């Protein structure tokens, strides 16, 4: 298994269990799901309707995003202006790190990052933002949105802002 860790905070952000797809050469998007946690009935994959039950969330259980829950991501909030301020600083830090470690990737990163940030800004109200467990303000902010179907959530993490660790 491969764990994707933030290059600045070392927080675990995602794993290869979520089948991440590379977009614009700079961002990994991985579909995730809303799942029940808590309560005492763990019928993964069971069909409660066929068992005479119902599909409601059990008492003591809550619906959570599986990636957010598994990697203990912490929700944070931005308005457009504060997001742009954050992302400019973050991109500058990633670019500096790339120039040390992989300078030939810098032009690809700059072009792709600019394209993806425009996409985020264009639909800003639809995005949710999360920090890693350490809540490091200089680290990556994981972005969450929904696919065109409106029901499938996905997270987006910056390819050049992570290190892959095999476990």
Curated annotation (Swiss-Prot):
Domain TCTP spans what residues?
1-167
Task: Give the intrachain disulfide bonds.
Answer: none
Q: Which GO terms describe its cellular component?
A: cytoplasm; cytoplasmic stress granule; cytosol; microtubule; mitochondrion
Which parts of the sequence carry Phosphoserine? 9, 15
State where the protein is found. Cytoplasm, Cytoskeleton; Mitochondrion
Molecular function terms from GO: calcium ion binding
Give the keywords, sorted: Cytoplasm, Cytoskeleton, Microtubule, Mitochondrion, Phosphoprotein, Protein biosynthesis
Tell me the InterPro entries matching this sequence. Answer: Mss4-like_sf, Mss4/transl-control_tumour, TCTP, Translation_control_tumour_CS, Translational_control_tumour_p
Which BP terms in the Gene Ontology apply to this protein? cytoplasmic translation; negative regulation of autophagy; negative regulation of microtubule depolymerization
**The organism's place on the tree of life at top rank:** Eukaryota
Q: Which family does it belong to?
A: Belongs to the TCTP family.
Any further remark recorded for this protein: Present with 27800 molecules/cell in log phase SD medium.
Protein function: Involved in protein synthesis. Involved in microtubule stabilization.
Describe, as the record does, how this protein assembles with itself and its partners.
Interacts with the 40S and 60S ribosomal subunits. Interacts with microtubules.
PANTHER family per the UniProt record, alphabetical:
TRANSLATIONALLY CONTROLLED TUMOR PROTEIN-RELATED, TRANSLATIONALLY-CONTROLLED TUMOR PROTEIN
Q: What is this protein called?
A: Translationally-controlled tumor protein homolog
Name the source organism: Saccharomyces cerevisiae (strain ATCC 204508 / S288c) (Baker's yeast)
Q: Which gene encodes it?
A: TMA19
